[in-house]
Amino acid sequence: MKSKKFLALLLVLVMAISVLASCKPADKPADADKPAETTEGKEEGKEEAPAETGALTEMPTDGEPDADQYINTFDTAHPNTLDPAKGSDSYGNGILLNILEPLVRIQDVKGQMGSVEYVPAGAESWDLSEDGLTYTFHVREGNVWNDGTPVTAKDYEYGIKRCIDPRTACPYANNTYYIKGAEKVNKTKLAEGQEPDYSEVGVVAKDDKTLEITLEHPVPFFIDIVTTRIFFPQRQDLVEQYQDTYSTSPETAPQCGPFILKDWVINSEQNYVKNDNYWDKDNVKLSKYKVSIIKDSNTIFNALKAGQIDYAGVGDPKWKGEFLNNPDYYSTVRANPDTTYFMFNCNADSNTGNNKVRQAISIALDRQELIDSCYNGVPTAAFDFVPPAVTVQGKEFNKLGEGWVKKLAEDNPDPKALFEEGVKEAGLGDPASVTIKLMGSDTSQEGRTSGEFVQQCLEEALGCKVEVDNQDWSQFINIVQTGKGWDIAWLAWGADFNDPSNFLETCHSQTAAYPTGYKNEEFDKLLDEAKVEQDADKRVQLFHDAEKILLYDDAALSPVIHRIANVFRRSYIRNANYSFFSTMGMSRIFTSGRK
């Protein structure tokens, strides 16, 4: 999740991962058509969880397709919207990859588990100018919306500009700032009834089949950003017709991808059918698939065992025994480029407005005990926000088991004393009477258990009170977005593309994912410099310096865990996505040998 930006995923996904994620890898300026290998490649294997007995090193991709092609899978929550310009959670991202058509997609390289490549999608090809500033996308002939209207370059142009439009309040708008003139327009305060001035914005549909995008400066990973939802096509006529209800339901969501979302029952199920008008329909094998909304991990595992769903992430050792050496399943293990974290309310009127209070909370949490007690030892402790699976133009950034939070703990051996000092500075009174309100979005048993663990851990270590409030995703995000009524929000962020900026810019004061009140001019400056810097080594240092400010000096957030995906699939599943960065959705999966 953006995630963007908000890939704020339910913590139950530590135990049961839906694997419909949508994120991306980085390309090199000299070769805009070839992405860098992700950290799921061979060189990064040392940072993944140890391979389980029976885990595959190559995904099954071949086999005679069954006559009846269908898949049953699950997700843990319903999206707030299907609007590419309005949503930001992984639940919506996963749907949009299947019902809309990005200009470019990212797929696994067959026979090279962990490697990925760009493939033409809504654009049949694209060119990059010699100066690295102008991308020309040649929009494909023959793709149509579900009402028969042709998909044109103007739909992509409109979609991007709608995300830039400040009236839209697009949560991913900062990822358009690489485009010439986009940031200025997005930050313009418009008078009532005033339209944005796009005359200097570098997004132009030259004709129905040619889209030209001009950047402020060369961006090594720009094609990765093009695969995200803010570059998906949108229908201006339907936005104007439906207004606030645009893409809030299957009926008001225009679709042009490999599948059509036929119907859904909110918080129950989603039903998809193959789009017979899709340009690449011959390579789409599934005729339908169903996504059930299941929040409880035991219910998920029972559904997998009973054949009600065809794959799931399994972390519980008791359940692993049911699947690991069972010939009816195969498994894969992958380190995810994501981080669950405590996001602190830094506003002065919150109980976490003081940086020493935040620092104390960050180092008081026993991450490994949390992992062992609540998550069966599956994920890994996080001491940096940017996960080890994310690189800088192919260069290693963070190492597993190291990080600024660990350094902070080493330099402050008494978190209670630090907490009391911060409480005194903030004028909060008696430390024992201070109540820290922790909000979470996991209403499952795992969510309650992990919340209770954190509550006990912090109360014992700091001598304060901790109140835990778990809400379902919609209520949670609505409360968090007010910036009031909470001190800590337990969130998750998953990479939308393979670059530290995708994580760190969620805390930039001008592009913040949430209204936390956090602002540090030096932090912002370092990220601004990294945005235009072309040298990978210099970018690494800029990001490290920025992350130190964020986690060590200011403790604006506190990373908790990096997740491991241990996915079990039915033996008849073929061509499933392995890479976290794949954007193929369900379009290449099929079954062979289903009994």
Language-model features: locations:
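N-terminal lobe/hinge region of extracytoplasmic solute-binding protein
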Residues: 74-130, 254
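Gly/Pro-rich hinge or "lid" segments in bacterial periplasmic/extracellular proteins
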Residues: 107-113, 188, 208-209, 215-284, ...
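Surface-exposed binding/hinge segments that line
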Residues: 157, 162-165, 169-237
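Ligand-site clamp/hinge motif
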Residues: 242, 277-322
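Ligand/substrate-recognition segments at binding pockets and active sites
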Residues: 266, 420-495, 565
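Extracytoplasmic/peripheral linker and loop segments enriched in polar/acidic and small residues
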Residues: 371-372, 408, 465-476, 502-570, ...
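Structural transition elements
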Residues: 380-422, 442-448
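Long beta-strand-rich cores associated with HINT superfamily self-processing modules
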Residues: 567-595
